[in-house]
């Protein structure tokens, strides 16, 4: 259940472009969107009048409650400020773009910050890459197909309840994508029994259906699959294909940087 969503913005067009996604999800769950800007005290252009630069609610979304606030960065790392603020507000989800202003003095939603939030946040986070040659190409305010990427590890099921909840609310198709890295042994049943249990534990047995399987070169394969099948969201943990190692994996990082749609992830 999503009751509160954090949307960080640096007021740039790119950062604000992720706002419709936050609002679209909030509308489905009757959730509140907390739209925040992290102000650098050294920037004379950031004042209380800057709240007028916050993105306006999309047409038809006026019923969604949006709270706007400017908070000081101080000497803190922007990613840490975002994660700490999300926890303090009791947010269930963070939605942000992966690029904002490139000016050093005003830039805080760059790839490094977005990836740090995705890598370290215990709160589920949706990252939409909205800048560059491999930017998000699908509409980000609607859901018809959600891809749940799993390596069958117990940790990989942690993102499934939220992905399933979004699919249930939006009536999107939730597709299970079972991935096997080079050298991984595939179960005799292809992972069906494990996935059936994952979906049952997530309260989403009715969404479980056909399983797709990918072998080797997992990051590239997931990105290619998401593009070919017009996925609107990829859901995964940052430990995808980790083999027990801690931290974000190269596979998860590649998907986060190259997926043709927003990526929903969590640190397990």
Per-region residue spans from a language model:
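A short, acidic, amphipathic alpha-helical segment used as a generic capping/interface helix at domain edges
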Residues: 196-199, 217-227
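Short, well-ordered secondary-structure micro-motifs
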Residues: 45-46, 106-107, 137-138, 159, ...
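Small/aliphatic-rich secondary-structure junction motif
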Residues: 1-52, 60-63, 141-190, 199-210, ...
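Residue-level marker for beta-strand->alpha-helix junctions and adjacent short loops that shape enzyme
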Residues: 12, 40, 75, 101-102, ...
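Intrinsically disordered, low-complexity Ser/Thr-rich linker and spacer segments
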Residues: 132-144
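Generic hydrophobic alpha-helical segments
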Residues: 22, 78-82, 163, 222
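Charged docking surfaces used in two-component/phosphorelay signaling
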Residues: 70-79, 213-221
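Gly/Ser-rich helix-loop-strand patches that form or flank binding pockets
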Residues: 83-135, 224-268
């Amino acid at each position: 259940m999503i009751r509160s969503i954090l949307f960080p913005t640096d007021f740039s067009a790119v950062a604000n472009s992720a706002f419709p996604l936050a609002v679209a999800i909030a509308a489905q769950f009757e959730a509140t969107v907390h739209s925040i800007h992290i102000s650098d005290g050294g920037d004379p252009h950031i004042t209380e009048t800057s709240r007028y630069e916050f993105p306006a609610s999309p047409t038809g979304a006026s019923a969604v409650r949006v709270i706007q606030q400017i908070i000081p960065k101080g000497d803190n790392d922007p990613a840490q400020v975002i994660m700490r603020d999300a926890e303090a507000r009791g947010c269930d989800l963070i939605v942000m773009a992966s690029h904002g202003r490139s000016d050093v003095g005003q830039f805080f939603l760059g790839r490094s910050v977005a990836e740090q939030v995705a890598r370290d946040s215990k709160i589920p986070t949706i990252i939409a890459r909205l800048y560059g040659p491999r930017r998000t190409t699908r509409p980000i305010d609607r859901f018809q197909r959600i891809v749940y990427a799993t390596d069958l590890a117990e940790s990989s099921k942690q993102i499934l309840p939220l992905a399933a909840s979004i699919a249930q609310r939006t009536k999107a198709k939730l597709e299970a994508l079972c991935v096997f890295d080079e050298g991984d042994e595939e179960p005799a049943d292809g992972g069906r029994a494990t996935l059936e249990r994952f979906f049952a534990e997530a309260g989403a047995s009715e969404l479980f259906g056909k399983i797709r399987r990918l072998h080797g070169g997992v990051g590239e394969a997931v990105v290619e699959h998401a593009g070919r099948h017009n996925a609107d969201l990829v859901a995964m943990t940052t430990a995808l294909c980790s083999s027990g190692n801690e931290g974000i994996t190269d596979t998860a990082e590649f998907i986060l940087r190259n997926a043709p749609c927003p990526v929903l992830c969590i640190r397990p």
